[in-house]
C-alpha cells in the first residue's frame, strides 16, 4: 500500500468519525434537552419520556457505530487499494 494512500485513508477515516461523533453529540444533546423540558412540564409522564429517550438515544448512537464500522473497513480492508 502506498504511504500517501494510507495517509489519505487515515485522514478520511478520522474526519468521517469526527463528523459522526459530532452529529451524535448534537443529536443526543437535543434529545436530552427535550426530555428534560417534557418531564418538567408534565412530571407524571416522566416514565414514558424516559423510555422514549433511551430508545431514541440508542438510534442516534447507532450512527456512530456505523461510522466506526465503515472506518475500520477503510483502515484494515480497504477495497480501493490493490
Swiss-Prot record:
InterPro entries: ATP_synth_csu_bac/chlpt (IPR005953), ATP_synth_F0_csu (IPR000454), ATP_synth_F0_csu_DDCD_BS (IPR020537), ATPase_proteolipid_c-like_dom (IPR002379), F/V-ATP_Csub_sf (IPR035921)
Chief subcellular location: membrane
Keyword Cell inner membrane annotated: yes
UniProt-annotated location(s): Cell inner membrane
Any one Gene Ontology molecular-function term assigned to this protein's record: lipid binding
GO CC terms: plasma membrane; proton-transporting ATP synthase complex; proton-transporting two-sector ATPase complex, proton-transporting domain
Record-annotated site: Reversibly protonated during proton transport: 61
Keyword terms of this UniProt record: ATP synthesis, Cell inner membrane, Cell membrane, CF(0), Hydrogen ion transport, Ion transport, Lipid-binding, Membrane, Transmembrane, Transmembrane helix, Transport
Origin superkingdom: Bacteria
Membrane topology: Multi-pass membrane protein
Function as written in the Swiss-Prot or TrEMBL entry: F(1)F(0) ATP synthase produces ATP from ADP in the presence of a proton or sodium gradient. F-type ATPases consist of two structural domains, F(1) containing the extramembraneous catalytic core and F(0) containing the membrane proton channel, linked together by a central stalk and a peripheral stalk. During catalysis, ATP synthesis in the catalytic domain of F(1) is coupled via a rotary mechanism of the central stalk subunits to proton translocation. Key component of the F(0) channel; it plays a direct role in translocation across the membrane. A homomeric c-ring of between 10-14 subunits forms the central stalk rotor element with the F(1) delta and epsilon subunits.
Family indicated by similarity: Belongs to the ATPase C chain family.
Oligomeric and partner information: F-type ATPases have 2 components, F(1) - the catalytic core - and F(0) - the membrane proton channel. F(1) has five subunits: alpha(3), beta(3), gamma(1), delta(1), epsilon(1). F(0) has three main subunits: a(1), b(2) and c(10-14). The alpha and beta chains form an alternating ring which encloses part of the gamma chain. F(1) is attached to F(0) by a central stalk formed by the gamma and epsilon chains, while a peripheral stalk is formed by the delta and b chains.
Name of the protein in its database record: ATP synthase subunit c
UniProt source species: Nitratidesulfovibrio vulgaris (strain ATCC 29579 / DSM 644 / CCUG 34227 / NCIMB 8303 / VKM B-1760 / Hildenborough) (Desulfovibrio vulgaris)
Gene: atpE
